[in-house]
């Protein structure tokens, strides 16, 4: 199947990363290799964070690749039922769902011992008789893909050789990730087949598809349902729209998804998932899913209470680097993440730190998603102690050993104003899991001092000045 070659490519990518050791290089101009070590390249790297604005689909794929297990989600789940008078069920075991034996076997073979928080509440609604529509908010790593795959597999009649379940994903790569979950969970259903409705998958005009489940991107699925008539939309029993927040950020996907939904029968079960519930996503969800049950996560606010924040006054890039060296010389740092505004600065800094003997990994937006995943995995395993990055990984990466976050450049938006949300996500990489963290901000101009002051005002938290030429002062902050 298509997944095999793609998964193999990822394995090869990570195997290549394993075999590369840290490189000691004299050149300033570098680019990231698969293991985040540094190698020569041309100087065409002058891109700001805003220009390489984090691509939502790539970030979502990255989160899937780097998560080997479910995240321990402490958020409260809020269930808003379509019929407030009907009883509200949640389950604590998969046996309570009365699944077909082959499905239960598949669930356990995947390593799921009990339902995750989102699964506890979503599965009884999705597997109810008659099936109910659902809009659910869930981040990567909460088990939502397994939940909707279970719903699809529960409805499929393997003896019927035509599409019965349709799942829309924003990109080919995300479709393949969902496909892998279907193949794993459905492996005790040998007669169950899966088709990918993605660009490049050429079929003869007029051909009918015999696979019971189709996963694809909106444009190709729309063509297959309408123009090419490969799929009879009136026979679809379950329609899943995954990553809705990513979907509406992509030109044309929103309209295509709505057009597909309008072709489906009235009794088709509609399921929509999104990591966020901003107004644009909510409006889209209501167009696509009639009479829904809604599951929301009451998000616990990220807090700065466990993080000590400092700033260092510098007059140049070299002074900022020297301040960084002084920090490393005075205190023990398990692992650190250092954020830069441009790829060029990140590349230069990674090279300089490497020359000083540090084990450095480098992340930037020009890397393929699989390369980024390999770099993050190595950092998580402690093979590199310093991760230098642009905004590309400010979110979603939990590395327990990160004790220090350094803003080599303060985060600003495209207009040069403080990007408070990014600041919060950046320094939130430390002080995780209830531990105390340390954040150090480099300030090298009146403008960056103004940015820092505005960040202080926004969070109502004082950021103390730190003199990195005073070793005693540095040692105090570590206690």
From Swiss-Prot:
Annotated region (N-terminal lobe) at 2-300
What changing residue 223 to R does, per the record, is:
Impairs interaction with NUP214 and RNA
Tell me the keywords, alphabetical order: Acetylation, ATP-binding, Cytoplasm, Helicase, Hydrolase, Nucleotide-binding, Nucleus, RNA-binding
Q: What reaction is this protein's catalytic activity? A: ATP + H2O = ADP + phosphate + H(+)
Which parts of the sequence are annotated with region: Disordered?
34-54
SMART domains per record = DEXDc, HELICc
The free-text domain note is: The N-terminal extension helix acts as an autoinhibitory domain, preventing ATP hydrolysis, unless the N-terminus of the protein is displaced by RNA binding, allowing cleft closure to bring key side chains into position for catalysis.
Q: What does this protein do?
A: ATP-dependent RNA helicase involved in mRNA export from the nucleus. Rather than unwinding RNA duplexes, DDX19B functions as a remodeler of ribonucleoprotein particles, whereby proteins bound to nuclear mRNA are dissociated and replaced by cytoplasmic mRNA binding proteins.
| Protein known as | ATP-dependent RNA helicase DDX19B
Give the organism the record lists.
Answer: Homo sapiens (Human)
